[in-house]
A protein has these predicted regions:
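Amphipathic alpha-helical polymerization modules
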Residues: 1-140
Length: 140
């Protein structure tokens, strides 16, 4: 009976460890999403700043803007947009890869926790029967 109790306690400890790991992974997932959101905001702010500088450059030129100047400004704006679009896509790809990795760990752990729960329940039933049998034996 003592071995049964020790086994149950070991399983309970194992389950608690896995659940704590799952909570850490969930927190890591939230932190990853928050960090990604903050980085996206920074990238978009940088893009806005660069576009504003180009706009100032255009506004600071003489009263009349030549077609070449206007075309050059449009090209700069297009380059800026492409640069920051690429930065955002790279960030999203990294974030999604990290999220998938964390979610896979969480998902892989779930069946183990369920299996340990089932084992604990089965061992508890065995312990209950054994305790009941001992009690009955001692009463007779």
């Amino acid at each position: 009976m003592l071995n049964l109790l020790l086994t149950i306690l070991t399983y309970v400890d194992l389950r608690a460890t896995w659940q704590a790991d799952a909570m850490k992974d969930s927190q890591m997932l939230q932190d990853t999403q928050l960090q990604s959101s903050n980085e996206q905001t920074q990238i978009m702010q940088q893009q806005t700043n660069e576009e504003a500088l180009v706009q100032l450059e255009l506004e600071g030129s003489e009263d009349s803007v030549s077609t070449e100047q206007y075309t050059a400004v449009l090209q700069k704006m297009s380059q800026i947009a492409a640069k920051f679009e690429s930065l955002l896509q790279n960030l999203m790809a990294k974030t999604q890869a990290k999220e998938r990795e964390i979610e896979q760990r969480i998902t892989a752990r779930e069946p183990k926790i369920k299996a340990v729960d089932a084992d604990i329940e089965s061992l508890q039933e065995t312990l209950d029967k054994s305790t009941e049998e001992q009690f009955t034996y001692m009463q007779s």
